[in-house]
A protein has these predicted regions:
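Short histidine-centered beta-strand/loop micro-motifs
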Residues: 37-38, 56-62, 103-105
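Glycine- and acidic-residue-biased ligand/ion/polar-headgroup-sensing regions
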Residues: 64-66, 70-75, 80
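Short acidic-glycine-tyrosine-enriched beta hairpin
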Residues: 81-96
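A short hydrophobic beta-strand segment most commonly corresponding to one strand
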Residues: 93, 107-125
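A short, N-terminal "cap"/entry segment at the start of jelly-roll beta-barrel domains
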Residues: 1-43, 128-147
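Conserved short histidine dyad/triad with adjacent acidic residue
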Residues: 32, 47-62, 96
Length: 147
């Protein structure tokens, strides 16, 4: 199977562009495309997420590890207790139980490919206590309040 990529629209033939999540999690201006969903003997899911300028993914963590490659644009990723600038071509390993969030720069998209196991645990949102711990770091507090 070959899915042709349209570089103008950042879409693949035969792949629907979906709402990022439908579980009530907080996010802003993010879409999801599922490019591969566990066919044959590879039980994984390969997805493309895109945040519009100023958009961001859910601040979350989970038990499973996942791999991300920035495919378009630039922005920041909150990974554990650090904020990193990222851009197209950067590869990010997100270990299980690591708090993370992707954010597009104002005026720029950020699109990323993400590989996860098809069978995985559910996302966990941060508790008020976990949020307080994060906000005790002034850089992270500023990052979280900047959107």
């Amino acid at each position: 199977m070959i899915r042709k990529f349209d570089a103008k629209d950042f879409k693949w033939d035969g792949v629907d562009t979906l709402v990022y999540k439908q579980d009530g999690s907080p996010f802003k201006d993010v879409t999801r495309q599922v490019l591969y969903d566990g066919a044959f003997d590879i039980p994984c899911q390969f997805r493309y997420f895109e945040c519009l300028p100023g958009g961001y993914s859910t601040l979350e963590y989970h038990e499973h590890t996942h791999m991300v490659m920035i495919f378009r644009g630039k922005g920041q990723v909150l990974l554990g207790d650090e904020i990193h600038d990222v851009e197209a071509g950067d590869f990010i390993e997100i270990p299980g139980k690591t708090i993370h969030q992707f954010r597009a720069n104002k005026g720029d998209y950020i699109g990323f490919l993400c590989l996860v196991n098809q069978d995985r645990d559910k996302v966990k949102l941060l508790t008020p206590q976990e949020m307080d711990t994060l906000r005790s770091n002034p850089k992270i507090k500023e990052f979280l309040e900047s959107c």
